[in-house]
């Protein structure tokens, strides 16, 4: 097969080029060695730019042409003018450029990764709305792909990830495909894929976790650690990222910035794929949350934004929107009596919500018993309040509490999915200092009693609640019960005031602001001149 000429290659790449340009006699084309034989359709050996990039290439070729006859020069001038007009009219085709349009999929055939939008990697192109879709190029109308990186080290990271996913679906429908992945568990080898188990062990042994948290905080400690870790897991993590072919990447975990950003930088993709961080700690947060190469860092509070600035991020990288919570918390709340009837609660007695997290941890039973005594008026022989207990996945605790003969109305639930309804049925909440639960309680206007926290990332949540007049802190079940009894009795004004303070501090629209800003980043970043094959 003879080697293709420049004009034949251009014709193959874009049949719409002016016939006059393609019929230029070979003496008018710059002298150069023969071009290599065209590769097979699945090869990424070379690429032919489309749009304005082609005009630049042709301009260089024409200017490289030396002296010729006057007639030939005149003809070349006319042909070039015609071609320039063509470029102005037809050369501005653009398409989203992310992993998919860069041809970085790991599937065979060049039609895409085979997962989500973009087809199943069948190779070759097709005609779409009269435009030729060339191999390796994502369809302009295909959904953009969002990849959320998280880890199940505590429930807050997954909850934030699912909230962002739900908001994307609610706001943009089929325009986006959203994938949530535990990057370390799913895409790294042992022992790195044991991160959730290691975290669970450490937080159960407080001194060990405290030493780990504060010992890795200095940059001179964690940066070399990430650099060394990248040596062992970069290949696997890169494959994990390419599997999803994202157009934008969101990290909701402090350990999901450094290694992925090193990979994107090594592949030259930092300017093409926005990488963003959504910080899910309300006040104190580990320094690994902040990386100077992120496109955007979404902070839940002014305190966190100050830490981001101190870590070296620019003000243009930082947005203070609040903590993302499930979109269902933004919907209008149903009447309290209706919610209480559905939950089997008394319609008139004030209610306290006692939570133990997803695993039902903490002094739940002791606190529930203390509340049962404090909310019963021995003189009148009647209850002054009621209790709704959420035990999570702790079935033994659920069974024990359900077997108790209570003097006050008590409803015991296991793992619940509609927390907004449970909160809407109650007047205050007792919980550990998890940021997600605090943010949700504030949206519902519930005064908060914090009964514990994890050293490090949750320590700052206690003053965040107390100093803003939204609640109190105590580890004593008896003292907690007394606070609730006072709120339901002689100190009801304090309960109302704290409810108002919580509503003032709440940011119910945070998740929607985040996804709309992400949408704008994708719109700005991913539209570049289209290429016919992998970059």
UniProtKB/Swiss-Prot annotation:
<keyword id="KW-0150">Chloroplast</keyword>
<dbReference type="InterPro" id="IPR009695">
    <property type="entry name" value="Diacylglyc_glucosyltr_N"/>
</dbReference>
<keyword id="KW-0328">Glycosyltransferase</keyword>
<dbReference type="Pfam" id="PF04101">
    <property type="entry name" value="Glyco_tran_28_C"/>
</dbReference>
<dbReference type="InterPro" id="IPR050519">
    <property type="entry name" value="Glycosyltransf_28_UgtP"/>
</dbReference>
<dbReference type="GO" id="GO:0031969">
    <property type="term" value="C:chloroplast membrane"/>
</dbReference>
<keyword id="KW-0808">Transferase</keyword>
<keyword id="KW-0809">Transit peptide</keyword>
<dbReference type="GO" id="GO:0046509">
    <property type="term" value="F:1,2-diacylglycerol 3-beta-galactosyltransferase activity"/>
</dbReference>
<keyword id="KW-0934">Plastid</keyword>
<comment type="similarity">
    <text>Belongs to the glycosyltransferase 28 family.</text>
</comment>
<dbReference type="InterPro" id="IPR007235">
    <property type="entry name" value="Glyco_trans_28_C"/>
</dbReference>
<dbReference type="Pfam" id="PF06925">
    <property type="entry name" value="MGDG_synth"/>
</dbReference>
<feature type="transit peptide" description="Chloroplast">
    <location>
        <begin position="1"/>
        <end position="109"/>
    </location>
</feature>
<dbReference type="GO" id="GO:0009247">
    <property type="term" value="P:glycolipid biosynthetic process"/>
</dbReference>
<protein>
    <recommendedName>
        <fullName>Probable monogalactosyldiacylglycerol synthase 1, chloroplastic</fullName>
        <ecNumber>2.4.1.46</ecNumber>
    </recommendedName>
</protein>
<keyword id="KW-0472">Membrane</keyword>
<comment type="function">
    <text>Involved in the synthesis of the major structural component of photosynthetic membranes.</text>
</comment>
């Amino acid at each position: 097969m003879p080697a293709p000429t420049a004009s034949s290659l251009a014709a193959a790449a874009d049949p719409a080029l002016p016939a006059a340009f393609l019929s230029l006699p070979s003496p008018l084309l710059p002298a150069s060695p023969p071009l290599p034989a065209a590769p097979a359709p699945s090869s990424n050996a070379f690429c032919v730019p489309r749009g304005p990039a082609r005009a630049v290439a042709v301009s260089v070729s024409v200017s490289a042409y030396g002296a010729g006859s006057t007639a030939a020069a005149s003809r070349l001038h006319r042909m070039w003018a015609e071609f320039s007009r063509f470029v102005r009219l037809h050369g501005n085709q653009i398409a989203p450029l992310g992993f998919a349009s860069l041809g970085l999929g790991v599937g065979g055939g060049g039609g895409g990764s085979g997962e989500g939008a973009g087809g199943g990697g069948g190779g070759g192109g097709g005609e779409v709305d009269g435009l030729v879709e060339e191999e390796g190029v994502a369809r302009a109308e295909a959904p953009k792909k969002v990849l959320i990186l998280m880890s199940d080290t505590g429930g807050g990271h997954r909850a934030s990830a699912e909230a962002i996913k739900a908001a994307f679906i609610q706001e943009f429908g089929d325009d986006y495909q959203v994938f949530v992945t535990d990057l370390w568990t799913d895409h790294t080898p042992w022992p790195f894929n044991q991160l959730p188990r290691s975290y669970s062990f450490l937080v159960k042994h407080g001194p060990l976790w405290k030493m780990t948290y504060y010992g890795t905080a200095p940059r001179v400690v964690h940066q070399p650690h990430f650099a060394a870790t990248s040596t062992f897991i970069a290949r696997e993590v890169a494959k994990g990222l390419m599997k999803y072919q994202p157009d934008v990447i969101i990290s909701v975990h402090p350990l999901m910035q450094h290694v992925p950003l090193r990979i994107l930088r090594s592949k030259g993709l930092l300017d093409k794929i926005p990488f963003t961080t959504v910080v899910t700690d309300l006040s104190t947060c580990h320094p690994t949350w902040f990386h100077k190469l992120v496109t955007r860092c979404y902070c839940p509070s002014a305190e966190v934004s100050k830490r981001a600035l101190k870590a070296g991020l620019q003000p243009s990288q930082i947005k203070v929107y609040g903590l993302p919570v499930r979109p269902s918390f933004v919907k209008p709340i149903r009447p309290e009596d209706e919610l209480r009837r559905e939950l089997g609660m008394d319609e008139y007695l004030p209610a306290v919500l006692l939570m133990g997290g997803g695993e039902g941890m903490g002094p739940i039973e002791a606190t529930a018993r203390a509340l049962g005594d404090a909310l019963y008026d021995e003189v009148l022989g009647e209850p002054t309040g009621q209790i709704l207990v959420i035990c999570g996945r702790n079935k033994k605790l659920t069974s024990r509490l359900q077997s108790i003969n209570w003097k006050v109305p008590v409803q015991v639930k296991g793992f619940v999915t509609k927390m907004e309804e449970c909160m809407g049925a109650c007047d205050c909440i007792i919980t550990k200092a998890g940021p997600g639960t605090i943010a949700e309680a504030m949206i519902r206007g519930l005064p908060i009693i914090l009964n514990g926290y994890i050293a490090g990332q949750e320590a700052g949540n206690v003053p965040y609640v107390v100093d803003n007049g939204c609640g109190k802190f105590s580890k004593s079940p008896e003292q907690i019960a007394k606070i609730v009894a006072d709120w339901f009795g002689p100190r009801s004004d304090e309960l109302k005031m704290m409810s108002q303070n919580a509503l003032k501090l709440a940011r119910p629209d945070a998740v929607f602001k985040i996804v709309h800003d992400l949408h704008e980043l994708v719109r700005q970043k991913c539209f570049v001149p289209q290429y016919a094959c992998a970059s």
